Amino acid sequence: MTLINPNIQESNKLKFKDESYLDFNSINGGDIRHDWSSEEIKEILDLPLMDLLWRAQIVHRSYNPGYKVQLASLLSVKTGGCSEDCAYCPQSVHNETTVQPNPVIEVESVLDRARAAKDAGADRFCMGWAWREIKDGNAFDSMLEMVRGVRELGLEACVTAGMITDSQASRLAEAGLTAYNHNLDTSPEHYSKIISTRTYQDRLETLRRVRMAGITVCCGGIIGMGESVSDRASLLKVLATLDPHPESVPINALVAVEGTPMEDLSSIDPLEMVRMVATARVIMPKSRIRLSAGRQQLGREAQILCLQSGADSIFYGDTLLTTSNPEVEADRKLLADAGITANFS
Protein backbone atom coordinates (compact mmCIF):
# COMPACT_ATOMS: atom_id res chain seq x y z
CA MET A 1 0.00 0.00 0.00
CA THR A 2 1.39 3.41 -0.99
CA LEU A 3 1.05 5.94 1.82
CA ILE A 4 2.97 8.81 0.24
CA ASN A 5 1.74 10.61 -2.83
CA PRO A 6 4.55 10.37 -5.43
CA ASN A 7 3.66 13.85 -6.66
CA ILE A 8 4.14 15.53 -3.28
CA GLN A 9 7.74 16.57 -3.97
CA GLU A 10 6.67 18.41 -7.12
CA SER A 11 3.63 19.95 -5.41
CA ASN A 12 5.97 21.50 -2.86
CA LYS A 13 7.24 23.82 -5.58
CA LEU A 14 5.50 27.17 -6.05
CA LYS A 15 5.83 28.77 -9.49
CA PHE A 16 5.96 32.57 -9.54
CA LYS A 17 4.71 34.77 -12.36
CA ASP A 18 8.26 35.36 -13.57
CA GLU A 19 8.60 31.55 -14.08
CA SER A 20 10.95 31.14 -11.09
CA TYR A 21 10.20 28.57 -8.40
CA LEU A 22 10.10 28.49 -4.63
CA ASP A 23 11.00 24.98 -3.51
CA PHE A 24 9.56 24.35 -0.06
CA ASN A 25 11.74 21.26 0.25
CA SER A 26 14.84 23.48 0.13
CA ILE A 27 13.40 25.72 2.87
CA ASN A 28 12.95 22.65 5.04
CA GLY A 29 16.55 21.76 4.33
CA GLY A 30 17.82 25.04 5.74
CA ASP A 31 18.01 27.16 2.59
CA ILE A 32 17.33 30.57 4.17
CA ARG A 33 16.89 33.40 1.65
CA HIS A 34 17.56 37.10 2.11
CA ASP A 35 16.82 38.18 -1.47
CA TRP A 36 13.02 38.15 -1.49
CA SER A 37 11.17 40.53 -3.78
CA SER A 38 7.91 42.24 -2.88
CA GLU A 39 6.31 40.57 -5.89
CA GLU A 40 7.24 37.08 -4.70
CA ILE A 41 5.96 37.78 -1.21
CA LYS A 42 2.68 39.19 -2.50
CA GLU A 43 2.17 36.05 -4.56
CA ILE A 44 2.57 34.00 -1.39
CA LEU A 45 0.17 36.28 0.52
CA ASP A 46 -2.37 35.89 -2.29
CA LEU A 47 -2.25 32.10 -2.49
CA PRO A 48 -5.53 30.23 -2.00
CA LEU A 49 -5.83 30.00 1.77
CA MET A 50 -5.62 26.21 1.96
CA ASP A 51 -2.47 26.20 -0.16
CA LEU A 52 -0.88 28.93 1.94
CA LEU A 53 -1.70 27.18 5.22
CA TRP A 54 -0.38 23.87 3.95
CA ARG A 55 2.88 25.31 2.68
CA ALA A 56 3.40 27.41 5.82
CA GLN A 57 2.81 24.35 7.95
CA ILE A 58 5.45 22.40 6.03
CA VAL A 59 7.99 25.04 7.05
CA HIS A 60 6.60 25.49 10.57
CA ARG A 61 6.69 21.76 11.35
CA SER A 62 10.25 21.54 10.09
CA TYR A 63 11.55 24.32 12.34
CA ASN A 64 9.17 23.91 15.29
CA PRO A 65 8.29 20.24 15.75
CA GLY A 66 5.61 19.79 18.37
CA TYR A 67 4.16 23.29 17.96
CA LYS A 68 5.94 24.74 20.99
CA VAL A 69 4.95 28.32 21.84
CA GLN A 70 6.87 30.85 23.91
CA LEU A 71 4.86 32.90 26.40
CA ALA A 72 6.05 36.50 26.70
CA SER A 73 4.82 39.13 29.15
CA LEU A 74 4.88 42.87 28.38
CA LEU A 75 4.88 45.73 30.91
CA SER A 76 4.58 49.46 30.19
CA VAL A 77 7.27 50.92 32.46
CA LYS A 78 6.74 54.49 31.21
CA THR A 79 3.24 55.16 29.89
CA GLY A 80 2.05 58.13 27.83
CA GLY A 81 3.53 61.52 27.01
CA CYS A 82 5.43 60.34 23.93
CA SER A 83 6.48 63.13 21.55
CA GLU A 84 6.10 60.95 18.44
CA ASP A 85 2.96 61.37 16.31
CA CYS A 86 2.22 57.71 15.47
CA ALA A 87 -1.36 57.77 14.17
CA TYR A 88 -2.31 54.50 15.86
CA CYS A 89 -0.88 55.18 19.31
CA PRO A 90 -2.88 56.30 22.38
CA GLN A 91 0.38 57.23 24.14
CA SER A 92 1.24 60.06 21.73
CA VAL A 93 0.87 63.64 23.00
CA HIS A 94 -0.49 64.46 19.54
CA ASN A 95 -3.55 62.24 20.08
CA GLU A 96 -6.41 63.09 22.44
CA THR A 97 -7.01 59.80 24.22
CA THR A 98 -7.75 58.80 27.78
CA VAL A 99 -4.16 57.65 28.33
CA GLN A 100 -2.41 60.02 30.72
CA PRO A 101 1.35 60.29 31.24
CA ASN A 102 2.47 58.26 34.24
CA PRO A 103 5.76 58.28 36.14
CA VAL A 104 8.29 55.57 35.41
CA ILE A 105 7.62 52.46 37.49
CA GLU A 106 10.33 51.86 40.10
CA VAL A 107 12.87 49.08 39.62
CA GLU A 108 11.65 46.78 42.38
CA SER A 109 8.04 47.09 41.26
CA VAL A 110 9.07 46.10 37.74
CA LEU A 111 10.95 43.09 39.09
CA ASP A 112 7.90 42.12 41.17
CA ARG A 113 5.89 42.08 37.94
CA ALA A 114 8.60 40.00 36.28
CA ARG A 115 8.45 37.46 39.12
CA ALA A 116 4.67 37.28 38.77
CA ALA A 117 4.99 36.78 35.01
CA LYS A 118 7.45 33.94 35.56
CA ASP A 119 5.16 32.34 38.14
CA ALA A 120 2.31 32.53 35.58
CA GLY A 121 4.39 30.66 33.02
CA ALA A 122 6.14 33.34 30.95
CA ASP A 123 9.82 32.97 30.15
CA ARG A 124 10.33 36.30 28.36
CA PHE A 125 9.68 39.64 30.03
CA CYS A 126 9.37 42.70 27.81
CA MET A 127 9.49 46.27 29.09
CA GLY A 128 8.28 49.35 27.22
CA TRP A 129 9.03 53.04 27.63
CA ALA A 130 6.91 55.60 25.72
CA TRP A 131 9.94 57.56 24.55
CA ARG A 132 11.15 58.88 21.21
CA GLU A 133 14.66 57.84 22.19
CA ILE A 134 16.66 56.70 25.18
CA LYS A 135 18.47 59.46 27.05
CA ASP A 136 21.46 58.88 29.31
CA GLY A 137 20.89 59.53 33.00
CA ASN A 138 19.02 58.09 35.96
CA ALA A 139 16.16 56.65 33.89
CA PHE A 140 18.59 54.74 31.67
CA ASP A 141 20.54 53.53 34.70
CA SER A 142 17.27 52.19 36.13
CA MET A 143 16.57 50.45 32.83
CA LEU A 144 19.93 48.70 33.03
CA GLU A 145 19.16 47.63 36.59
CA MET A 146 15.81 46.23 35.47
CA VAL A 147 17.45 44.27 32.67
CA ARG A 148 19.99 42.77 35.06
CA GLY A 149 17.25 41.90 37.53
CA VAL A 150 15.06 40.22 34.93
CA ARG A 151 17.98 38.15 33.67
CA GLU A 152 18.84 37.10 37.23
CA LEU A 153 15.30 35.69 37.47
CA GLY A 154 16.12 33.37 34.58
CA LEU A 155 13.90 35.21 32.11
CA GLU A 156 14.72 36.58 28.69
CA ALA A 157 14.67 40.39 28.80
CA CYS A 158 13.40 42.59 25.98
CA VAL A 159 13.24 46.40 25.90
CA THR A 160 11.39 48.78 23.60
CA ALA A 161 12.18 52.44 24.17
CA GLY A 162 12.67 54.18 20.84
CA MET A 163 15.89 55.14 19.13
CA ILE A 164 19.21 54.22 20.68
CA THR A 165 22.89 55.18 20.42
CA ASP A 166 25.79 52.79 19.92
CA SER A 167 26.96 53.40 23.48
CA GLN A 168 23.53 52.72 24.95
CA ALA A 169 23.19 49.53 22.93
CA SER A 170 26.57 48.36 24.21
CA ARG A 171 25.62 49.06 27.82
CA LEU A 172 22.34 47.19 27.42
CA ALA A 173 24.23 44.25 25.94
CA GLU A 174 26.62 44.30 28.90
CA ALA A 175 23.62 44.26 31.26
CA GLY A 176 22.47 41.05 29.59
CA LEU A 177 19.62 42.31 27.39
CA THR A 178 18.28 39.49 25.25
CA ALA A 179 16.41 41.52 22.64
CA TYR A 180 15.58 45.08 21.65
CA ASN A 181 12.24 45.75 19.97
CA HIS A 182 11.93 48.45 17.34
CA ASN A 183 9.09 47.88 14.88
CA LEU A 184 8.97 49.19 11.32
CA ASP A 185 5.17 49.48 11.70
CA THR A 186 4.34 49.36 7.98
CA SER A 187 5.84 49.49 4.49
CA PRO A 188 8.21 52.26 3.37
CA GLU A 189 5.53 53.36 0.89
CA HIS A 190 2.74 53.69 3.50
CA TYR A 191 4.93 54.99 6.31
CA SER A 192 4.37 58.74 5.78
CA LYS A 193 0.65 58.22 6.41
CA ILE A 194 1.40 56.80 9.86
CA ILE A 195 4.17 58.95 11.35
CA SER A 196 6.11 62.10 10.50
CA THR A 197 8.39 62.55 13.52
CA ARG A 198 10.77 59.69 12.72
CA THR A 199 11.97 58.43 9.36
CA TYR A 200 12.00 54.87 8.12
CA GLN A 201 15.76 55.12 7.88
CA ASP A 202 15.89 56.14 11.56
CA ARG A 203 14.21 52.85 12.38
CA LEU A 204 16.58 50.81 10.23
CA GLU A 205 19.55 52.59 11.80
CA THR A 206 18.31 51.65 15.27
CA LEU A 207 18.09 48.02 14.18
CA ARG A 208 21.65 48.21 12.86
CA ARG A 209 22.93 49.54 16.18
CA VAL A 210 21.14 46.82 18.12
CA ARG A 211 22.58 44.13 15.85
CA MET A 212 26.11 45.56 16.06
CA ALA A 213 25.94 45.44 19.88
CA GLY A 214 25.20 41.72 19.77
CA ILE A 215 21.60 42.04 20.96
CA THR A 216 18.96 40.03 19.13
CA VAL A 217 16.48 42.02 17.04
CA CYS A 218 12.71 42.09 17.61
CA CYS A 219 11.03 43.85 14.71
CA GLY A 220 7.65 43.56 13.04
CA GLY A 221 4.66 45.67 12.13
CA ILE A 222 0.95 46.36 12.29
CA ILE A 223 -1.75 45.50 9.78
CA GLY A 224 -5.14 47.16 9.46
CA MET A 225 -3.89 50.76 9.20
CA GLY A 226 -5.33 51.39 5.75
CA GLU A 227 -2.46 49.75 3.92
CA SER A 228 -2.80 47.56 0.82
CA VAL A 229 -1.78 43.93 0.45
CA SER A 230 1.18 45.23 -1.55
CA ASP A 231 2.17 47.32 1.46
CA ARG A 232 2.08 44.23 3.65
CA ALA A 233 4.29 42.41 1.17
CA SER A 234 6.67 45.38 1.12
CA LEU A 235 6.93 45.41 4.92
CA LEU A 236 7.68 41.70 4.95
CA LYS A 237 10.25 42.20 2.20
CA VAL A 238 12.17 44.73 4.32
CA LEU A 239 12.18 42.31 7.25
CA ALA A 240 13.07 39.26 5.16
CA THR A 241 15.96 40.97 3.36
CA LEU A 242 17.67 41.87 6.63
CA ASP A 243 20.66 39.58 7.11
CA PRO A 244 20.27 37.89 9.48
CA HIS A 245 16.49 37.94 9.76
CA PRO A 246 15.10 39.41 12.99
CA GLU A 247 15.08 36.70 15.63
CA SER A 248 11.63 37.90 16.68
CA VAL A 249 8.89 39.22 14.37
CA PRO A 250 5.77 40.53 16.16
CA ILE A 251 2.70 40.73 13.92
CA ASN A 252 0.08 43.12 15.29
CA ALA A 253 -3.48 43.92 14.24
CA LEU A 254 -4.53 47.53 14.73
CA VAL A 255 -6.49 48.18 17.90
CA ALA A 256 -8.39 51.34 16.93
CA VAL A 257 -8.40 53.68 19.95
CA GLU A 258 -10.77 56.60 20.34
CA GLY A 259 -8.93 59.89 20.04
CA THR A 260 -6.37 58.66 17.52
CA PRO A 261 -6.56 59.44 13.78
CA MET A 262 -7.33 55.75 13.21
CA GLU A 263 -10.24 55.50 15.63
CA ASP A 264 -12.80 54.86 12.86
CA LEU A 265 -10.90 52.11 11.03
CA SER A 266 -12.66 48.76 11.00
CA SER A 267 -11.09 45.63 12.44
CA ILE A 268 -9.33 43.42 9.93
CA ASP A 269 -10.80 40.16 8.73
CA PRO A 270 -9.12 37.59 11.04
CA LEU A 271 -7.97 35.58 8.03
CA GLU A 272 -5.81 38.54 6.97
CA MET A 273 -3.79 38.02 10.14
CA VAL A 274 -3.59 34.30 9.40
CA ARG A 275 -2.21 35.07 5.92
CA MET A 276 0.33 37.53 7.32
CA VAL A 277 1.59 35.08 9.92
CA ALA A 278 1.77 32.19 7.45
CA THR A 279 3.68 34.24 4.88
CA ALA A 280 6.11 35.52 7.52
CA ARG A 281 6.79 31.92 8.50
CA VAL A 282 7.49 30.86 4.91
CA ILE A 283 9.98 33.64 4.20
CA MET A 284 11.61 33.78 7.67
CA PRO A 285 11.67 30.11 8.70
CA LYS A 286 13.86 30.45 11.79
CA SER A 287 12.39 33.66 13.21
CA ARG A 288 10.02 33.57 16.14
CA ILE A 289 6.71 34.91 14.81
CA ARG A 290 4.89 36.60 17.69
CA LEU A 291 1.12 36.86 17.61
CA SER A 292 0.84 40.25 19.27
CA ALA A 293 -1.66 43.11 19.69
CA GLY A 294 -5.20 42.69 18.43
CA ARG A 295 -5.53 39.01 19.30
CA GLN A 296 -8.84 39.54 21.07
CA GLN A 297 -10.55 40.63 17.87
CA LEU A 298 -9.40 37.51 16.01
CA GLY A 299 -11.39 34.88 17.88
CA ARG A 300 -10.19 31.47 19.05
CA GLU A 301 -10.37 29.74 15.69
CA ALA A 302 -8.26 32.32 13.85
CA GLN A 303 -5.71 32.36 16.67
CA ILE A 304 -5.37 28.59 16.40
CA LEU A 305 -4.92 28.87 12.63
CA CYS A 306 -2.14 31.41 13.25
CA LEU A 307 -0.47 29.03 15.70
CA GLN A 308 -0.85 26.16 13.25
CA SER A 309 0.61 28.08 10.31
CA GLY A 310 3.55 29.85 11.87
CA ALA A 311 3.10 31.77 15.12
CA ASP A 312 5.28 30.36 17.89
CA SER A 313 4.87 33.03 20.56
CA ILE A 314 2.05 34.99 22.16
CA PHE A 315 2.03 37.88 24.57
CA TYR A 316 0.66 36.56 27.82
CA GLY A 317 -1.23 38.65 30.36
CA ASP A 318 -4.32 40.84 30.43
CA THR A 319 -2.67 44.04 29.10
CA LEU A 320 -0.33 44.91 26.23
CA LEU A 321 1.07 48.34 27.10
CA THR A 322 -2.27 50.23 27.08
CA THR A 323 -4.53 47.79 25.20
CA SER A 324 -6.38 44.75 26.50
CA ASN A 325 -5.22 41.20 25.93
CA PRO A 326 -6.85 37.81 26.63
CA GLU A 327 -6.86 36.67 30.26
CA VAL A 328 -4.14 34.22 31.31
CA GLU A 329 -6.63 31.42 31.96
CA ALA A 330 -8.23 31.95 28.55
CA ASP A 331 -4.83 31.61 26.88
CA ARG A 332 -4.01 28.49 28.86
CA LYS A 333 -7.26 26.93 27.70
CA LEU A 334 -6.65 28.04 24.11
CA LEU A 335 -3.24 26.38 24.03
CA ALA A 336 -4.52 23.25 25.76
CA ASP A 337 -7.46 22.92 23.38
CA ALA A 338 -5.08 23.28 20.43
CA GLY A 339 -2.68 20.70 21.86
CA ILE A 340 0.16 23.23 21.99
CA THR A 341 3.07 23.13 24.42
CA ALA A 342 4.43 26.25 26.13
CA ASN A 343 7.24 27.35 26.72
CA PHE A 344 10.54 27.09 24.93
CA SER A 345 13.63 29.28 24.64
Swiss-Prot record:
Ranges that cross the membrane: none
Q: Which GO terms describe its molecular function?
A: 2 iron, 2 sulfur cluster binding; 4 iron, 4 sulfur cluster binding; biotin synthase activity; iron ion binding
Specify which residues bind [2Fe-2S] cluster according to the UniProt entry for this protein: 126, 158, 218, 290
Which residues make up the binding site for [4Fe-4S] cluster? 82, 86, 89
Q: Where is the Radical SAM core domain?
A: 67-295
Supply the PROSITE patterns for this chain: RADICAL_SAM
Q: Which cofactor does it need?
A: [4Fe-4S] cluster; [2Fe-2S] cluster
Chemical reaction(s) catalysed = (4R,5S)-dethiobiotin + (sulfur carrier)-SH + 2 reduced [2Fe-2S]-[ferredoxin] + 2 S-adenosyl-L-methionine = (sulfur carrier)-H + biotin + 2 5'-deoxyadenosine + 2 L-methionine + 2 oxidized [2Fe-2S]-[ferredoxin]
Asked if the record carries the keyword 4Fe-4S, the reply is yes
Q: Mind telling me which InterPro entries this protein's record contains?
A: Aldolase_TIM, BATS_dom, Biotin_synth/BioAB, Biotin_synthase, Elp3/MiaA/NifB-like_rSAM, rSAM
**The keyword Iron appears for this protein:** yes
Note the superkingdom of the native organism: Bacteria
Question: Keywords of this protein's UniProt record, alphabetized?
Answer: 2Fe-2S, 4Fe-4S, Biotin biosynthesis, Iron, Iron-sulfur, Metal-binding, S-adenosyl-L-methionine, Transferase
Q: Could you give a single Gene Ontology term from the biological process aspect? A: biotin biosynthetic process
How, per the record, is the cofactor bound? Binds 1 [4Fe-4S] cluster. The cluster is coordinated with 3 cysteines and an exchangeable S-adenosyl-L-methionine.
- State its Enzyme Commission number(s): 2.8.1.6
The biological pathway it contributes to is:
Cofactor biosynthesis; biotin biosynthesis; biotin from 7,8-diaminononanoate: step 2/2
Q: Which family does it belong to?
A: Belongs to the radical SAM superfamily. Biotin synthase family.
Q: How does it assemble?
A: Homodimer.
Which PANTHER family would you find in this protein's record?
BIOTIN SYNTHASE, BIOTIN SYNTHASE, MITOCHONDRIAL
Function recorded in the entry: Catalyzes the conversion of dethiobiotin (DTB) to biotin by the insertion of a sulfur atom into dethiobiotin via a radical-based mechanism.
Quote the protein name from its UniProt record.
Answer: Biotin synthase
UniProt source species: Prochlorococcus marinus (strain NATL1A)
According to the entry, what is the taxonomic lineage of the organism?
Bacteria, Bacillati, Cyanobacteriota, Cyanophyceae, Synechococcales
